[in-house]
């Protein structure tokens, strides 16, 4: 979790954005929980949202670090197209308020076939970072 938070913080600061952070704190989905950190900030130019998302995606939770090297390794070695494995989901308010989340677990339906994309790890094995 700390890798992702540090990465997002660095990317935002490199873009001149100084966010307010809260977390980490537990977020629950049924019986499952994970650590979550929220970033709040204002974009002076809403037209920058697309380029900001491009800068942030994929996060280390999806791709690894260093980003370019890890991304190239995945493309060269994974053996399938991730397509909708991850991305951003959320609300784009016409009045300017936006809530976006990194989405890691997705489903894709094509030609009567369902593909589920999921990732995870055991925190006890890898540690809590």
Residue positions per predicted region:
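Contiguous alpha-helical scaffold segments within structured protein domains
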Residues: 1-75
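Glycine-rich, small/acidic residue-mixed loop/short-helix segments
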Residues: 63-69, 73-129
């Amino acid at each position: 979790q700390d890798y992702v938070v540090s990465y997002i913080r660095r990317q935002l600061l490199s873009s001149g954005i100084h966010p307010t952070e809260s977390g980490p704190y537990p977020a629950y989905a049924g019986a499952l929980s994970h650590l979550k950190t929220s970033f709040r900030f204002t974009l002076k130019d809403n037209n920058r949202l697309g380029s900001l998302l491009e800068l942030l995606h994929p996060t280390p939770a999806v791709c690894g670090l260093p980003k370019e090297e890890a991304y190239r390794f995945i493309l060269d070695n994974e053996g399938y197209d991730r397509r909708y494995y991850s991305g951003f989901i959320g609300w784009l308010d016409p009045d300017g308020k936006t809530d976006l989340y990194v989405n890691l677990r997705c489903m894709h339906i094509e030609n009567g076939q369902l593909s589920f994309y999921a990732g995870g790890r055991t925190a006890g094995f890898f540690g809590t970072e």
